[in-house]
């Protein structure tokens, strides 16, 4: 076989959201820091080529992420990783952190200790502490101490043709989110509304990014609203969430970074205090436990330290390869499954 590139992927999902983990064949990524490596993947043609190799057809699909496992830059970390999605490489993700932790332990790359194993993960957004509950060689659950999360703006407003004036919060939880109370759109978060929520989320994200500029004060490589997360409250008090993602799909998990950003807004409004915890449910009913571990500051701004607890499950392992003579090897997309956003991808 005439393969010029080959990588091994462990198939993992966290509460329904796919987060494949590249455990072998990952090339060296240039950069002195993980943030530098993130920047390279998003700006260098070779970085874009690597991302397209993994996330576009014929090897990829619009759903899920691929996590590149990398050597840690920080001596305190056990491993580093960067999240690859069709739109770009991303700095941080709660569900993907749980997938990576599960992969590291269940593959034996990091020795599993029972009943508890601590894994330090390095992301472009900072260190994430993962505490895995382990039993009989299985990773039962993972609790993440997320990066400090903060509010950029509460009750921002944007005028829309479809829904009139929409209020939203801008907050950071590892990436920037626009957090929208879903009932403003006349919708509820349930599986039957997934397509309508996606269409609304993608429209709002585009309009917000055109009008508002957000940049992390300490990490310039993290800028712009990455996702719109719709939120609601279930009758039992659980937070119901739906994060909308490029090219036009919903997060199957409750979303760790989105809940971290939302936690910052809840604290800013006086609705939670250190030591509090609550359930967050996704559009398919899967759950995270969200906790407020403590308070801190980021560049002089008040910030919260969130915890997220969820489960990861391995479901397969496979290899992907590139035939040097394959005319479609660089990847391709079509609007039938990728939607109109397919036309914006530069192959």
Curated annotation (Swiss-Prot):
Q: What GO annotations for molecular function exist for this entry?
A: 4-hydroxyproline epimerase activity; trans-L-3-hydroxyproline dehydratase activity
Per UniProt, the keywords (alphabetical) are: Isomerase
Which catalytic residues are annotated? Answer: 93, 255
Q: What class of enzyme is it?
A: isomerase
Which Pfam families does the entry link to? Pro_racemase (PF05544)
Q: Which reaction does it catalyse?
A: trans-4-hydroxy-L-proline = cis-4-hydroxy-D-proline
Q: Is-annotated flag, keyword Transmembrane?
A: no
EC number annotated for this UniProt entry: 5.1.1.8
* Domain of life of the native organism: Bacteria
- Record keyword Oxidoreductase present: no
Q: Where does substrate bind?
A: 85, 94-95, 251, 256-257
Q: Give the family, as the similarity comment puts it.
A: Belongs to the proline racemase family.
Described by its record, this protein's role is as follows: Catalyzes the epimerization of trans-4-hydroxy-L-proline (t4LHyp) to cis-4-hydroxy-D-proline (c4DHyp). May be involved in a degradation pathway of t4LHyp. Can also catalyze the epimerization of trans-3-hydroxy-L-proline (t3LHyp) to cis-3-hydroxy-D-proline (c3DHyp) in vitro. Displays no proline racemase activity.
Name listed for the protein in its UniProt record? 4-hydroxyproline 2-epimerase
Species per Swiss-Prot/TrEMBL record: Allorhizobium ampelinum (strain ATCC BAA-846 / DSM 112012 / S4)
Top-down, what is the taxonomic lineage of the species of origin?
Bacteria, Pseudomonadati, Pseudomonadota, Alphaproteobacteria, Hyphomicrobiales
């Amino acid at each position: 076989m005439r393969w010029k590139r080959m990588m091994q992927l462990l198939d993992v999902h966290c509460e329904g959201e796919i987060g494949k983990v590249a455990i072998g064949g990952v090339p060296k990524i240039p950069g002195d820091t993980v943030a530098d490596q993130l920047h390279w993947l998003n700006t260098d043609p070779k970085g874009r080529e690597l991302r397209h190799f993994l996330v576009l057809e014929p090897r990829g699909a619009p759903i899920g992420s691929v996590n590149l496992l990398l050597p840690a830059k920080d001596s305190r970390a056990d491993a580093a990783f960067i999240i690859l999605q069709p739109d770009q490489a991303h700095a941080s993700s709660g569900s993907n952190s749980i997938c990576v932790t599960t992969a590291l332990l269940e593959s034996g790359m990091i020795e599993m200790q029972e009943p508890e194993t601590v894994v330090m993960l390095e992301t472009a957004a900072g260190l994430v502490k993962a505490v895995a509950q382990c039993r009989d060689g299985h990773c039962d659950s993972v609790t993440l101490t997320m990066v400090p999360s903060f509010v950029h703006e509460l009750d921002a407003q944007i005028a829309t043709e479809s829904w009139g004036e929409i209020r939203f919060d801008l907050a950071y939880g590892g990436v920037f989110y626009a957090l929208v109370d879903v009932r403003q759109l006349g919708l509820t978060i349930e599986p039957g509304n997934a397509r309508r929520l996606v269409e609304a989320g993608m429209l709002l994200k585009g309009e917000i990014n055109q009008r508002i500029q957000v940049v992390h004060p300490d990490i310039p490589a993290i800028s712009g609203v990455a996702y719109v997360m719709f939120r609601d409250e279930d009758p039992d008090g659980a937070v119901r969430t739906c994060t909308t993602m490029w090219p036009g799909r919903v997060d199957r998990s409750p979303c760790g970074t989105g809940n971290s950003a939302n936690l910052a807004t809840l604290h800013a409004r006086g609705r939670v205090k250190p030591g509090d915890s609550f359930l967050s449910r996704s559009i398919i009913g899967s759950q995270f436990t969200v906790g407020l571990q403590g308070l801190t500051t980021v560049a002089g701004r008040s910030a919260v330290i969130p915890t997220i607890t969820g489960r990861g499950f391995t479901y397969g392992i496979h290899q992907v390869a590139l035939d040097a003579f394959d005319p479609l090897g660089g990847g391709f997309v079509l609007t039938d499954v990728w939607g109109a956003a397919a036309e914006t991808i530069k192959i």
